[in-house]
Each structure stands twice: as C-alpha cells, then as structure tokens.
C-alpha cells in the first residue's frame, strides 16, 4: 500500500527543530528574512564541458564560470561593462547553445503568465581569438520587437523564437537574417510554438518549439483556441506596480479560459523544413478532446517524439513521427486508474540508442529503460518507494542517477545504479537532498537540509565524495539556536481503507496541552 506524506500545519521554515531554550520569536524578525537560509541559485552546467558550471553575479552584470571540483571562479564569460557594443547594463537571465559556443542573454523581461514572458534577447559568442580571449561582441537577436521562448539549434548557428504568436527563424551565420515561419498567429485565436493559458498552467511549460538533431527541421505545436470561451477581468491602477493608464478608468484583460466541461484548444503538430521552407502537419492520432503536452526531437533527426494524453489524463501515449513523411507510430503507452502525473514528460530523456521513462504502473513511481524503438529493456528501479526525479545516465559507465524516498517518504536521497544493477546511495546525510549534475555526469551539486540543519550546498563527484562545501549556513544555525523555536513532530496513521499517511504538526514552543 502506498504511503502519502501530508503537512497538517504551515511551517516557518525547516529550522523548526532547534532547542527551546532562548529568546522568543519576534514577528518583525520573521518577516524581515532574518531566518531565511542563504542559497545558491541560477546554476547552469556548461554544455559540452563536464568540468564547469556558470552563474550570474548578484548585480546581474556578469556570467561567471566555476569549477565543479573546487567551486572557485575560473573565468568571467560575460561582463556587460566591458563587452563591446553592449547597450544594456544588467540582464535578467541567459542560456547556452547546446554546444556551449554561444550565450543567449535576456533583458527587459516582461511576465505574461506563470511561466511565460517576453524579453529582448542578445547573442554573445564564446568563440576565442588566437590569443585565447573571448571575442567579446554583443549582437541583438532581432530588431522586430521582444521575443518569446528563443531556442538555439543544436549546431548553435540558428535561433527560433515566437513573436505575436508566430514563429521566426534567425540564421546567425548570415548576418542574423530573420525570416517568418508561420503567418496565422493571432491573439486569442491561434498560437504557434507557445502553449495557451491552460496548457502552460496545467502542464508547466512555456515552449512548444523544437529543432531536429541535425538543425535542419523545426517542429512546433499549433494551438487553435478560436472556439474556447473567453474570460475577462478588470485592470486597476494599483500601487505596486502602478499602472498610469488605469488611474481614471479601469481597463480590461480578455483571454481564452476553458472552464470545466468547455472545449479546449484544438492542437496539432507541424514541422518546417528550413531548407525547402515546406510546412507539414504530423498525423498524430490524438483524441478530438485530447492533449499534446510535449514534443521533443530525439537524437535521430528523423524521429520526433510526440506525447499525448486523453481528456481524463489517465492514458499517456508516446509516438515517434517522421518529420517529413508525417507518419507517426506508437512507441509506448502508459495507463493509470487515476491519472498520469505531469513529471512523466520531463523525465523522458533521449539518448542515441535509448530513452528513460518513469511510471507508476507497478504501484510505485519507478524508472524504466527503453530502446529507441520503444522496446522495454529493463526496469531500473523496483521496490516500495518512489523515484522522485531521474537525474541522468552516464553512457561510459552505464550508470543511472536518480533521487528517491527509499529511506522514508519524509526524506529524499541521491542514488546511483551501475550497469550490473548495484545500487549506491551517494548522499551521506539523512533529510532532503537534491542534485544537479555536470554535463558529463562526473560531478554534481548537492543541496541538503533537515529539521535541524538549514541548507548545505556541496560539490561532489559521482561516487558521492564531497569535493567542496559552497555554503553551510553555519551562522544562521548558530543564530537560531538562541531562540525558542517550535518543533515539528512527525507521526503516521492509517485511514479507514488501510492507507498509511505520514504527517507532521508544529506547536508553539511554550505549548503545554
């Protein structure tokens, strides 16, 4: 029988387990952020370079390269103050080309919904001159206006993006020449390459646009929402932020919002041949009221993965489609008596000859290994526990890396299973662990905390050996020890149907009942 973890009361933070022998908590101190653990965010492993990761500085003016072995800075990859032809002083985010040769830098970011936004993007080449120094020139991606979801081609020589619900393509080797791929995009009618509101909200993604492995094809999902009912709400001036246009009269925002029982967008998958400029519709057998929550090219340029769900979201199908012939063949089907969790989509990772898949078909969430043809080769994990996240596969060692709650539903740990099936726990501390691996799977950054320990961030090799401690929040732990903190109490109980539930409750430090 599955175990389900529940939280019965809200928590101040994970520091609720310290001794009750000191000062009382003060509301001003709580809301000031005084007890918030320090963290390291925005870490991006550098593609094609298994030894380093990158991070932008606190001022959002630089992108710095760090060593996975030591955690020490190695080089400043980008500096807005010194880059040539750079017209911005700060930036909001960035991403690498798949081969690590270029950066895509986002500025003037404007949020749309939970995951979506527009931004003005710039290209920065990391190509080095004969003296070993980076070329150091910034180029604007497009002069046509802000962009959504820009994505590099695998060879790093093209960028596709969406503007005003249409797809555009920029060829970087031809003076950043820009061409329009779709023409029918229109607000509240048709979206190309980006999901509508309900897809973005329910399936947690903001890009439905992919390049083929050989950089010769584009694939995208088209959302036709013309028949979806509209919903409107008023816009007021407000205070933070303040909108001047609505000071005297409120405005109105209208978008397509399908309530229960109403029609969703009609979705279809299309491909665009960059050389011939031919657009084709893929023949995917999706239900009329079904969903296409993801598309993704495999490492075979002639094999596009299309993922579908029925309206009840309890049947998942994975199709492999030929982007030119448009023929789609069913590779995998997974069904549930309840529903398919959305973490299935992003735990599917394609390798040259295989792909990973996570399913609850055994009663617990486990990792499976398939051939690229869709044949199940083996069940990688098994037992009465849940795989929480597939972290990657090392083809050289034949090893799988993942996080799971095998020790307890209240904990998470990092594990490795080698080609012989031997399982090794890599994280050494009991509590909550999460990991981010290097591009070559030789190193990882581990984030750990438990009831008595604020976040500790370490760098480790793939045997679990700690190479460096980046942050331990020791000062915060010492500070907290001087306060009367409420303490979490863990417990389990059984429901009337025999399901074991895990929970915790937190009482005031002076609670005596």
What is each stretch, according to the model?
Residues 27, 33, 71-73, 108-113, ...:
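Predominantly five- to eight-bladed beta-propeller fold
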Residues 38-44, 88-95, 194-214, 294-295, ...:
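Signature of short aromatic-glycine-proline-rich micro-motifs recurring in repeat-based ectodomains
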Residues 41-44, 51-65, 74-77, 92, ...:
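Non-catalytic accessory segments flanking enzyme active sites
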Residues 47-49, 98-99, 154-155, 213-214, ...:
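Residue-level detector of Asp-centered blade-edge/turn motifs that repeat once per structural unit
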Residues 51-53, 103-104, 156-159, 215-218, ...:
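Hydrophobic beta-strand positions that form the internal "hydrophobic ladder"
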Residues 60-65, 113-120, 164-170, 227-233, ...:
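Structural motif
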Residues 72-110, 137-146, 332-338, 384:
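Blade-loop segments of beta-propeller domains
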Residues 115-168, 174-208:
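Asp-box/WD-like beta-propeller blade repeats and closely related beta-sheet repeat scaffolds
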């Amino acid at each position: 029988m599955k175990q389900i973890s529940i939280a019965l009361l809200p928590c101040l933070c994970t520091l609720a387990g310290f001794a009750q022998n000191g000062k009382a908590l003060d509301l001003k101190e709580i809301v000031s952020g005084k007890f918030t653990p320090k963290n390291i965010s925005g870490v991006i492993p550098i593609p094609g370079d298994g030894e380093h990761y990158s991070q932008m500085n606190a001022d959002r003016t630089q992108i710095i390269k760090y060593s996975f072995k030591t955690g020490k800075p190695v080089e400043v990859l980008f500096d807005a103050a010194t880059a040539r032809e750079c017209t911005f002083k700060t930036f909001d985010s960035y991403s690498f080309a798949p081969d690590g040769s270029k950066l895509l830098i986002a500025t003037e970011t404007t949020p749309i919904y939970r995951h979506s936004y527009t931004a003005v993007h710039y290209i920065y080449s990391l190509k080095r001159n004969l003296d070993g120094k980076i070329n150091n020139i910034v180029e604007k991606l497009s002069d046509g206006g802000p962009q959504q979801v820009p994505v590099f081609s695998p060879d790093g020589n093209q960028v596709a993006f969406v503007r005003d619900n249409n797809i555009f393509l920029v060829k970087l080797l031809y003076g950043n020449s820009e061409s329009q791929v779709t023409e029918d995009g229109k607000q509240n009618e048709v979206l190309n390459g980006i999901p509508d509101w309900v897809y973005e909200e329910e399936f947690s993604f903001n890009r439905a646009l992919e390049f083929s492995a050989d950089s010769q094809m584009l694939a995208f999902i088209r959302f036709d929402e013309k028949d979806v009912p509209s919903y409107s709400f008023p816009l007021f001036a407000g205070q933070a932020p303040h909108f001047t246009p609505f000071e005297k009269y409120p405005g109105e925002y209208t978008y397509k919002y399908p309530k229960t029982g109403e029609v969703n967008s009609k979705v279809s998958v299309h491909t665009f041949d960059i050389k011939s400029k031919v657009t084709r519709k893929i023949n995917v057998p999706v239900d009329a009221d079904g969903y296409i929550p993801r598309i993704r090219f495999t490492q075979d340029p002639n094999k596009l993965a299309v993922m579908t769900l029925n309206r009840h979201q309890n049947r998942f199908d994975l199709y492999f489609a030929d982007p030119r012939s448009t023929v789609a063949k069913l590779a995998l089907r997974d069904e549930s008596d309840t529903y398919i969790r959305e973490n299935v989509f992003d735990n599917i990772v394609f390798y040259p000859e295989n792909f990973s898949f996570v399913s609850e078909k055994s009663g617990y969430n486990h990792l499976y290994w398939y051939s690229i043809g869709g044949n199940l080769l083996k069940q990688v994990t098994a037992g009465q526990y849940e795989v929480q996240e597939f972290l990657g596969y090392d083809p050289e060692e034949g090893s799988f890396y993942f996080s799971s709650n095998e020790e307890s539903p209240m904990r998470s740990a990092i594990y490795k299973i080698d080609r012989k099936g031997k399982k090794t726990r890599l994280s050494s501390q009991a509590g909550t662990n999460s990991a981010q691996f290097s591009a070559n799977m030789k190193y990882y950054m581990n984030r750990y905390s438990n009831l008595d320990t604020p976040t500790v961030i370490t760098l480790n090799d793939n045997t679990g050996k700690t190479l460096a401690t980046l942050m331990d929040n020791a000062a915060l732990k010492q500070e907290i020890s001087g306060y009367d903190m409420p303490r979490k109490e863990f417990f389990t109980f059984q429901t009337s149907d025999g399901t074991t539930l895990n929970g915790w409750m937190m009482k005031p430090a002076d609670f005596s009942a």
